[in-house]
Design a protein with these regions (language model features):
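Hydrophobic alpha-helical transmembrane segments of integral membrane proteins
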Residues: 46-47, 90, 97-98, 234, ...
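Generic structural signal for short, solvent-exposed loop/turn connectors between secondary structure elements
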Residues: 76-80, 93, 268-276
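Aromatic-enriched
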Residues: 241-313
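Primarily membrane-embedded glycan-assembly and transfer machineries that use lipid-linked glycans
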Residues: 1-82, 104-236, 243-244, 248, ...
């Protein structure tokens, strides 16, 4: 697309990645799209998701990230190797890859883990062949610059960052304190993912693959110190996975309210953080985290269908 005029290249980039994003949301919701409410509203809810407009305004990669993340998780059971390739293609977003290998190992998803690893190695090899080994020195230098200027010093604006690290810095905390707080959040997110994805876990009702997928996306946002407002686009597949897992019988009124708040929040997150110091995006991500964990832990505490049958016998 570098050969195209800028406006045309931008339109093609955003249009193609937006189409991928919508296709993935449709695939996630396919099992429940016969429901009247879902059939009427899913496309409108996905297309009008406020984070989508934030991403469009920045011309950024939120649609692609949401599409790859959602597709990789949707393909995990039927096409594990393809799932791994899709995870591997997310290597351009390394801050979102912190928990993915942990989840795959905890869940015993060896083929997906292998596929992701091979894809990342292949991409790294292709970059080296195309640009030479100096590309990695440039990458390391740019990473250091991004860490110092954009993250620690907040040159991008702490109100634009939607992470625990940024919240502490926005409230006047030092860099060391912000790293400690972020590390604590990352450890909690990691342990939650291991709990949810560990091999032999329950895969029925709301404790199924869809809820595990939603939790991984949400925990990824909690674990990363570098989450920009347009990155909240990946909440769309997380919300879709939760709806697919729990709709309609396992939703309570407060569940629906929480999902509605998460849907609206990206529209105001940056402005509210800048005006009041309240990290709305982070609060919504944390709220979704507790919602997913509540459903998961409730299902884990209930006897399985097989156990119930044995007890009845």
């Amino acid at each position: 697309m570098a050969l195209l005029p800028y406006s045309l290249a931008l339109a093609v980039w955003q249009g193609a990645s937006f189409a991928l994003y919508l296709a993935v949301i449709a695939a996630i919701l396919r099992p429940i799209r016969n429901d009247g409410t879902i059939a009427r509203l899913w496309l409108l809810a996905a297309a009008a998701f406020p984070a989508a407009f934030v991403n469009l305004g920045h011309g950024q990669n939120g649609f692609l990230t949401a599409g790859l993340f959602g597709a990789a998780l949707a393909m995990l059971a039927p096409r594990p190797l393809l799932s791994g390739v899709l995870f591997g293609l997310m290597a351009y977003k390394p801050q979102f890859g912190l928990l993915i290998p942990i989840a795959l190992l905890a869940g015993g998803q060896w083929r997906t883990f292998l596929g992701a690893g091979i894809t990342v190695i292949a991409l790294a090899g292709a970059a080296t062949l195309a640009f030479g080994p100096e590309v990695w020195r440039a990458f390391a230098a740019s990473t250091e610059t991004s860490r110092t200027l954009l993250l620690e010093q907040g040159n991008v604006g702490f109100e634009k960052l939607q992470s625990v690290f940024a919240a502490v810095r926005m409230w006047g905390g030092g860099v060391s304190l912000a790293y400690v707080a972020q590390a604590a959040a990352s450890v909690i997110a990691l342990l939650s993912v291991v709990y949810a994805w560990r091999a032999g876990g329950t895969w029925r009702a709301c404790g199924d693959r869809n809820l595990k997928a939603a939790l991984l996306i949400i925990a990824t946002l909690l674990a990363s110190p570098h989450v920009l407002d347009y990155d909240l686009t990946i909440l769309a597949p997380a919300i879709a996975f939760m709806v697919a897992s729990c709709w309609p019988d396992d939703f309570r009124d407060d569940d629906i309210s929480a999902l509605a708040a998460a849907w609206f929040a990206p529209l105001f997150a940056r402005a509210i953080a800048g005006a009041t110091g309240v990290p709305l995006g982070l609060i919504v991500v944390a709220m979704l985290y507790f919602l997913a964990m509540r459903h998961l832990m409730r299902d884990r505490s209930m006897p399985s269908i097989e156990t119930a049958r044995i007890a009845q016998a």
